[in-house]
């Protein structure tokens, strides 16, 4: 017997039973309604909407695969906001159509491309105005594991003053050059934070306390493009936030699978190099304070 047939049979016998028990008619009606609703409605309709924690998905020309990402995220959390960062493909129309039939999804549009950090700042500023306090950032390309969203959010709710970081676990689909290359950047980031415990500075699947992140971003002109994730992690650690690492599997998609990458090895590695030069200068200037802060954290 199929699941649908099983549910139909249960509802039939429940209804027959209530004919001899009039007081249970209302209960029976709700039971049948729940059977039908659970069978045909997406899980996202059963989610409780958070008043404090929101998911932000910045995207730039992500292709049609962004809908798969958004739907996977919506199954795990509400609300979800997508920030379109000057996209020129047809994904914006697809996202707006999706949001029109999903009250838990909102699409914000920046007409000019400003970079991932710029998109996150735009969405975060609006979210703060609406009373949200924390944001989990998810890449639009589907590499981040949506089923782990409740885990990261729960940890953030338990430790609201911490920076909750996804720590990537790579499989065979991950390009070796990128996996090995990030070790260099992570080494510098850990030095710049006196090895406070950054599991991975480049992985963008993380929960930010938004007020602290907004303050950091408004106090400098950088962190707007590919340098956003690592510089945000370092500067928030400088601000005293404790990093908490949670293992998260990463999946890379080929072009044939709809994967889209805007990473440019030359341009973005130069950007990261310049970022670490700036951060090392800041690290040296702040070293006495950072040492005191680290000692206090170790004693806590």
Question: Could you describe each region identified by the protein language model?
Answer:
Residues 61-75:
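Short, well-formed alpha-helical segments that are part of the catalytic scaffolds
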Residues 84-93, 142:
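A conserved acidic beta->alpha catalytic loop
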Residues 132-141:
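Short beta-strand-to-loop acidic/aromatic patch adjacent to the donor-nucleotide binding site
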Residues 38-50, 219-300:
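Hydrophobic helical membrane-anchoring modules
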Residues 64-68, 89-98:
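Acidic helix N-cap motif at the loop->helix transition within catalytic regions
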Residues 111-112, 117-129, 146-226, 253-263, ...:
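Acceptor/aglycone-binding surface of glycosyltransferases and processive sugar-polymer synthases
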Residues 78-87, 108-110:
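Short beta-strand/loop segment that forms part of the nucleotide-sugar
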């Amino acid at each position: 017997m199929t699941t649908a047939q099983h549910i139909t049979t249960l509802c039939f016998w429940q209804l027959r039973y209530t004919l001899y028990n009039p007081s249970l008619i209302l209960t029976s009606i709700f039971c049948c309604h729940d059977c039908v609703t659970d069978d045909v409605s997406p899980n996202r309709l059963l989610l409780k909407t958070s008043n404090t924690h929101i998911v932000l998905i910045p995207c730039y020309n992500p292709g049609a695969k962004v809908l798969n990402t958004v739907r996977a995220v919506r199954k795990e959390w509400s609300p979800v906001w997508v920030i379109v960062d000057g996209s020129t493909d047809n994904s914006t129309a697809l996202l707006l159509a999706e949001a029109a039939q999903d009250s838990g999804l909102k699409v914000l549009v920046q007409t000019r491309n400003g970079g991932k950090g710029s998109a996150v700042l735009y969405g975060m500023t609006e979210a703060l105005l609406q009373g949200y306090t924390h944001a989990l950032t998810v890449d639009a390309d589907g590499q981040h594991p949506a089923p782990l969203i409740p885990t990261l959010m729960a940890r953030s709710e338990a430790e609201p003053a911490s920076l909750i970081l996804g720590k990537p676990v790579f499989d065979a689909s991950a390009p070796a050059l990128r996996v090995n290359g990030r070790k260099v950047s992570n080494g510098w980031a850990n030095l710049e934070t006196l090895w406070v415990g950054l599991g991975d500075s480049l992985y963008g699947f993380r929960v930010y306390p938004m007020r602290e992140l907004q303050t950091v971003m408004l106090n400098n002109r950088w962190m707007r493009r590919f340098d956003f994730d690592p510089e945000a992690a370092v500067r928030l650690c400088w601000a005293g936030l404790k990093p908490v690492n949670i293992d998260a599997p990463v999946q890379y998609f080929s072009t044939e699978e709809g994967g889209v990458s805007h990473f440019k090895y030359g341009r973005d590695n130069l950007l990261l190099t310049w970022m670490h030069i700036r951060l090392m200068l800041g690290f040296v200037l702040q070293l006495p304070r950072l040492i005191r802060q680290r000692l206090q954290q170790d004693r806590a």
